Amino acid sequence: MNQTFRKMNCKNYILIIFTLLSTGLFAKSKTPTVSEKNMGAYLMVYFKDDTHGLYFALSKDGYSFTDVNNAKPIIAGDTIAEQKGIRDPYIMRGPDGMFYMALTDLHIYAQKLGLRDSLWERSGKDFGWGNNRGLVLLKSPDLIHWTHSVLRVDKAFPELANIGCAWAPEMINDKARNRIMMYFTMRFGNGKCKVYYTYMNKDFTAMETLPKSIFEYPDGKEYIDADITKVGNKYHLFICSHNGGAHVEQAISDSINSGYKLNPKRCDGEKRGCEAPTIYKRIGQNKWVLIYDVYSIHPNNFGFSETSDFENFTYLGHFNEGVMKTTNFSIPKHPAVIQITKKEAERLAAKWKLKMKF
């Protein structure tokens, strides 16, 4: 081998190695971690019945929330959903530093608005109230720029062809599987609803596993709208139980997707029906807030309970009836709340021209 060839070969090797490193093929996997000490604000996502659009609200203290777009949708449902409307938004910060959202692809007033000829997509007798087949998936690096896709649950696996609904998706990172576990309410035909879990692909566009039941309510009773929060070594599965009304209960397990045992003690403080429970932690405090949708009052509102031990819950009332406040919006539906950094909150406020300090 002559010297000229060796020099050329060396240059080629350097070029190849540089290319592999720059494309990430040899790069060490980076998992951005943002600890609670870096958090400085809260982001609430919700929707409204009158628009079936997606809304964002910010809070500095976790008590008072301000809509970023003056109570107008930040994303219109008809731009991302097959049914031209979304419901039940959920948001999480992924292990890769990206933000992930999952929403129900459903418009319950589509016929009234001339968006379809029938009350529901399919027969209400055969597939039930609010029948749908899809979920909307969103992904963003910065809470501002979003990509989206529609996951047709009924087409994902042959076993799901006859589903009656796919509602209220939520997500949690399963570190053991290195995957986002998504779980959502589902029924077959016009049968009973319960919650199923699945693992998403890396691109967050498809399910990798056939959904399985995550929890069986005693005596086969129906339940909907699950939320999983890990505290210590325990997983707390909050649900909307349909056992003698609609109210919030929890089941507890040592495992993320199995072994849940019901604690039938009610967690909400409502006299009437509520659903869509979700938990967020107060920054720097040993306190968690349970927030849920009190759909049975008019106008509907959110209700709140607070806990420090996940056994005893102190009722905080509704928005604008106690310590929890809104500054510029009302009649919200189906909430989810995450902690965000001061910089993320400021960037989001600047995007929507919201004058708010953090």
Name each region found by the language model.
Residues 1-33:
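Bacterial Sec-dependent N-terminal signal peptides
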